């Protein structure tokens, strides 16, 4: 049944909804073929250190072809713990604002991008929180329909997505009583968007700064303090901050 379901979903997405653009990848090996090729092979364990490369994270934010940034095991672990420290900020009750294993985080951005890869895939994993993956965030009506099923406490997005949600007539009917954190990244946050979001949801949008080359969260705003659009926040735990001209 899983194989039949997968075939049905792929067929609808590709042939009916036409969501897959035409492409050609020379010498490409499909994921299913790779699984078949490796089915009879054993696992060879290789010792690794924190300085060994764990991920080739590709970025289009460069001249020419997309380039893969080499991220080490130590880089991934350190960044997860830095974000974990940020989420451990205390509320008025003396307890962490973001509670491990109890939060529902909405993940509408692609996990192949460094922002969602770090914040959702890596950092929610280490904190034991639940990610809700939004498969097609461009379908704003479907996005909002999915949000209605959850008492979500966090949402990561970017300016254009926030505007699209705010402009939809059904967005205001959502329950925002559990929303503790909204974060914007990838592009600049417009002041008018931040003000509209705060007025509708009651939750201010935080911003940060990071690079693909060192993972996404180099600097971020405190969770409890009022935020000002354009302010990138403080360096994360263990980070240095130096401005050069």
Predicted regions and their residues:
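ANL superfamily adenylate-forming
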Residues: 1-50
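Short beta-strand->loop structural element characteristic of the AMP-binding/adenylate-forming
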Residues: 1, 67-70, 107, 130-136, ...
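Conserved beta-loop-beta connector loops within the AMP-binding
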Residues: 242-245
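Conserved S/T- and glycine-rich ATP-binding loop of Class I adenylate-forming
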Residues: 53, 59-62, 105, 111, ...
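Conserved AMP-binding/adenylation subdomain of ANL enzymes
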Residues: 77-104, 112-153, 168
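Gly/Ser/Thr-rich phosphate-binding loop
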Residues: 4, 8, 19-20, 129, ...
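Conserved AMP-binding A3 loop
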Residues: 45, 54-81
């Amino acid at each position: 049944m899983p194989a039949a379901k997968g075939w049905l979903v792929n067929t609808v997405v590709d042939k009916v909804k036409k969501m897959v653009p035409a492409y050609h990848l020379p010498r490409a090996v499909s994921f299913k073929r790779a699984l078949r090729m490796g089915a009879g092979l054993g696992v060879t364990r290789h010792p690794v250190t924190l300085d060994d490369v764990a991920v080739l994270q590709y970025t289009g934010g460069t001249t020419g072809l997309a380039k893969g940034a080499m991220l080490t095991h130590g880089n991934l672990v350190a960044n997860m713990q830095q974000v974990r420290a940020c989420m451990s900020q205390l509320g008025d009750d003396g307890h962490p604002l973001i509670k491990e294993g109890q939060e529902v985080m909405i993940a509408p951005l692609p996990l192949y991008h460094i922002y969602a890869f770090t914040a959702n895939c890596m950092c929610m994993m280490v904190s034991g929180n639940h990610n809700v993956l939004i498969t097609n965030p461009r379908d704003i009506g479907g996005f909002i329909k999915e949000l209605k099923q959850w008492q979500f406490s966090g949402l990561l997005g970017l300016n254009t997505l926030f505007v699209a949600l705010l402009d939809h007539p059904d967005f205001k009917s959502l329950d925002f009583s559990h929303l503790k954190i909204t974060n914007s990244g990838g592009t600049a946050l417009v002041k008018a968007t931040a003000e509209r979001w705060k007025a509708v949801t009651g939750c201010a949008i935080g911003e940060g700064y990071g690079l693909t080359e060192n993972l996404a969260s180099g600097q971020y705003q405190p969770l409890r303090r009022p935020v000002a659009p354009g302010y990138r926040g403080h360096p994360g735990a263990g980070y240095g901050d130096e401005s050069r001209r």
